[in-house]
């Protein structure tokens, strides 16, 4: 018997001979179901008799037939309670405890799932039962049919009979298949006794006229088939075991698929929620960044507007300051011209007294202190020393007309502080521009004429022009030595062209405003040197025309005064050519 119980797999293989005696179509279907059940975990051995015992078989995933029948009996007994109760969980706990009393350890959840699977398979079998034989569609069909068709009051009395008959079937049909008949009564004798004992109080309501034919028809359908053929009942048991295995495998697979499907749905749900949260977070981040960019742009716009306002304000202030500076310069120039006109007609001092300024000349130094005192002190110390050398040279020749010309060095000394004051007050905001203002040209002429004796000596001319540039910077004019030299050459060339034209220049000529100044300087050099080596700086026409050279100096003085008195800011015409013959020796 132990060999039959333990080697259930070999005995199932030996069952091929009765199965092969069936019709080909049914044989093929049963073989396919049997192979599927065998692949799921050796279903034939478990369905043969449960040689491992009820306790060991109940702990696995498969439900043996006896355990399933016990579950159906307990569920049938409690059918009315299940129908009336709203909460089913405590009832399934009670079903689990009853199964534990019978020796089957199953949780309430497992019991509920098993019953639902059996009920589902019953409904499916009932729908497709028309094309099959009675009793071969599903081995628990009769029990479930009785459970679903009986009224609630008689369900507790009917189900024990419908369940008790299949339990005794292996003993009645033990002759054809010793594999199922011999191990079951001996190894599991106690559980069937408990079943019979548990259903001893139920026999009184057995004689039911309405349900009698139902039970006989349903319960003994397999017996009728077994009496028709000697091997029929055992084949039905085999088929039901295979069906149970198929149901168990399919239900487990469906359960797995259902669990997997439920998990997939939950995952999809969570993924959707996560996606929504991420999208909202991204949208919030984008809006936050847009707000930051907008605020930054607004701040930049405000800063740009403020900068534009500041630039406009500074431009207005600069314009006002330049206008005020121009007005003050013109006012100072008018005052100086008035003083020059006054002093030019009243001052007649000898050259020896030129170092001691008379009382009428005290106001101009006061004006220079008010306008710009530091550049005046430096310019006077540098300009008075070289200019004093001109009278010393003029004293040497004794010609008679030297007396009228003796006033010219004094007048130049008077004019130089005044010109320096004008230059210091008219310092332009762009001293390094390409155009030279009138005051700057006059300052260059004064500095260059003051260094004429040094230019006559054999000394490097570059150092002298550097000194002139330094003196110009002290006076407020930013000109380098090269620019000063080029400007000096240009004004001498322009003076030569104007002189060669032999046109009578008016006293208020706007072009070449420094003509009279240069003319006066050149005339003084002719008279002082006597036409010697210093005549190289004089133009050719001045050498050839003694009449013009002997022109009275008073006219030149008046021209100089009128030139300084005019407040016009007209500049000289630009000269592109370089001097070719003027002052070769001096430069």
From Swiss-Prot:
Residues 538-547, 559-568 have a biased composition (Polar residues). Disruption phenotype: Increased water deficit tolerance and higher integrated water use efficiency (WUE) by reducing daytime transpiration associated with a higher expression of SDD1. Increased trichome cell size with normal patterning and branching accompanied with an increase in the nuclear DNA content only in trichomes that have completed branching. No visible phenotype under normal growth conditions, but the double mutant seedlings gtl1-1 and df1-1 exhibit increased root hair length. Residues 201-210, 356-366 have a biased composition (Pro residues). A motif (Nuclear localization signal 2) lies at residues 472-479. It comes from the Eukaryota. Residues 233-242 have a biased composition (Acidic residues). Residues 285-328 form a coiled coil. The keyword Transcription regulation applies. This is Trihelix transcription factor GTL1. The gene is GTL1.
């Amino acid at each position: 018997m132990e060999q039959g119980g333990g080697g259930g797999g070999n005995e199932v293989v030996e069952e091929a001979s009765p199965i092969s005696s069936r019709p080909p179509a049914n044989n093929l279907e049963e073989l396919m179901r049997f192979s599927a059940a065998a692949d799921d975990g050796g279903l034939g051995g478990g369905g043969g008799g449960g040689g491992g015992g009820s306790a060991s078989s109940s702990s696995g995933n498969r439900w043996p037939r006896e355990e399933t029948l016990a579950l159906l009996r307990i569920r049938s007994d409690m059918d009315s309670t299940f129908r009336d109760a709203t909460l089913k969980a405590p009832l399934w706990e009670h079903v689990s405890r009853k199964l534990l009393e019978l020796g089957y350890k199953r949780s309430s959840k497992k019991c509920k799932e098993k019953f639902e699977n059996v009920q589902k398979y019953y409904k499916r079998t009932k729908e497709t039962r028309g094309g099959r034989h009675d009793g071969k569609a599903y081995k628990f069909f009769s029990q479930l049919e009785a459970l679903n068709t009986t009224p609630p009051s008689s369900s507790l009395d009917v189900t024990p009979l419908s369940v008790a008959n299949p339990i005794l079937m292996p003993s009645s049909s033990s002759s054809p298949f010793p594999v199922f008949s011999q191990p079951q009564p001996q190894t599991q004798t106690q559980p069937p006794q408990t079943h019979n004992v548990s259903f001893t109080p139920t026999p009184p309501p057995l004689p039911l006229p309405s349900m009698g034919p139902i039970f006989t028809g349903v319960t003994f359908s397999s017996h009728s088939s077994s009496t028709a053929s000697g091997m029929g009942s055992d084949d039905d048991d085999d088929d039901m075991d295979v069906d149970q295995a198929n149901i168990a495998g399919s239900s487990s697979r469906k359960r797995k698929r259902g669990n997997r499907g439920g998990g997939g749905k939950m995952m999809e749900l969570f993924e959707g929620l996560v996606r929504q949260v991420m999208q909202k977070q991204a949208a919030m981040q984008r809006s936050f960044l847009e707000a930051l960019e907008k605020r930054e742009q607004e701040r930049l716009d405000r800063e740009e507007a403020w900068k534009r306002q500041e630039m406009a304000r500074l431009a207005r202030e600069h314009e006002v300051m330049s206008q005020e500076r121009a007005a003050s310069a013109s006012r100072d120039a008018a005052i100086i011209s008035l003083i020059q006109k006054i002093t030019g007609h009243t001052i007649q001092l000898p050259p020896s007294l030129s170092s001691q300024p008379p009382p009428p000349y005290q106001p101009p130094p006061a004006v220079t202190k008010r306008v710009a005192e530091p550049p005046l002190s430096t310019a006077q110390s540098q300009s008075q020393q070289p200019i004093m050398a001109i009278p010393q040279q003029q004293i040497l020749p004794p010609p008679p007309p030297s007396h009228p010309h003796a006033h010219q060095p004094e007048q130049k000394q008077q004019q130089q502080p005044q010109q320096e004051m004008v230059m210091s007050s008219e310092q332009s905001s762009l001293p390094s521009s390409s155009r030279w203002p009138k005051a700057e040209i006059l300052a260059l002429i004064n500095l260059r004429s003051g260094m004429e004796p040094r230019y006559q000596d054999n000394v490097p001319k570059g150092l002298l022009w550097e000194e002139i540039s330094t003196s110009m910077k002290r006076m407020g004019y930013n000109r380098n030595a090269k620019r000063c030299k080029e400007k000096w050459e240009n004004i001498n060339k322009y003076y030569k062209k104007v002189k060669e034209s032999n046109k009578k220049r008016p006293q208020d000529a706007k072009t070449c405003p420094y003509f009279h100044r240069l003319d006066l300087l050149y005339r003084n050099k002719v008279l002082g040197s006597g036409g010697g080596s210093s005549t190289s700086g004089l133009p050719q026409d001045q050498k050839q025309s003694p009449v013009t050279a002997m022109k009275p100096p008073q006219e030149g003085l008046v021209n100089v005064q009128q030139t300084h008195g005019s407040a016009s800011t007209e500049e000289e015409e630009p000269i592109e050519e370089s001097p070719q013959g003027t002052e070769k020796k001096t430069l």
